[in-house]
Regions:
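PRPP-associated nucleotide enzymes
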Residues: 1-122, 126, 130-205
Length: 205
């Protein structure tokens, strides 16, 4: 796995907190589990500083990826992320449609590509991993080879292992534990808050 710098991790963690992308409270996850925190990556593009820091950490994560590998974001949160990462890394981008049009050319995946091309999937985070497995099917239908997933955050809920058991690599720039630890060190979280978040993470691994 490519290592990203401590400075990049710190910049991202502080941005997630500063702009309310990482929220604290009581939230119901897709799995039905109640969580004391939630990461709302769908608002990232509204905050240029956060968007910049996040695009840069993806660039570090992808630095050893061959230049001919296409990037693709998973709708919806992954699309603006992949677009920003493609721009800062000068990489070609394709985009799976959330819903196939019934007019025009009716493409499953927008952009220039051909069967046999390799694709790196960009997404925001992984929790249980089921949505990642589902996403692969669209690319397989188009005979594109998925080389792996590249994400900002691993929520450490077993999703990484599920994806890897399916035969795909998954690299995250940082874990939720790393992000929470940075916020505690920067006095953005109290000791009690930190203990609660870490306990939840450990209980749901």
């Amino acid at each position: 796995m490519n290592q990203v710098s401590d400075e990049a991790k710190r910049n991202v963690a502080l941005s997630l907190n500063k702009y309310g992308i990482l929220k604290f409270g009581e939230f119901k996850l897709k799995s039905g589990i109640m969580s004391p925190f939630y990461i709302d990556m769908r608002i990232v593009q509204s905050f240029p500083e956060a968007f910049h820091n996040i695009a840069n950490i993806y660039a570090e994560l992808l630095k050893d990826l061959p230049q001919d590998v296409l990037l693709a974001g998973i709708p919806e949160a992954g699309i603006p992320l992949a677009t920003a990462v493609g721009y800062v890394t000068n990489r070609p981008l394709i985009q799976p449609r959330a819903k196939v049009k019934d007019h025009g050319v009716g493409k499953l995946i927008e952009g220039e590509w051909k069967p046999g091309d390799k694709v790196a999937i960009i997404d925001d985070l992984v929790a249980k991993g089921d949505s990642k497995i589902e996403a692969i099917e669209r690319f397989k239908e188009c005979e594109l080879e998925v080389v792996g997933f590249f994400l900002l955050l691993d929520r450490e809920m077993g999703g990484k292992q599920i994806v890897e058991q399916a035969g795909y690599t998954l690299e995250a720039a940082m874990t939720i534990t790393e992000a929470l630890t940075i916020l505690k060190e920067e006095n953005k979280l109290s000791a009690d808050q930190y203990r609660e978040m870490i306990a939840f993470t450990r209980e749901n691994q």
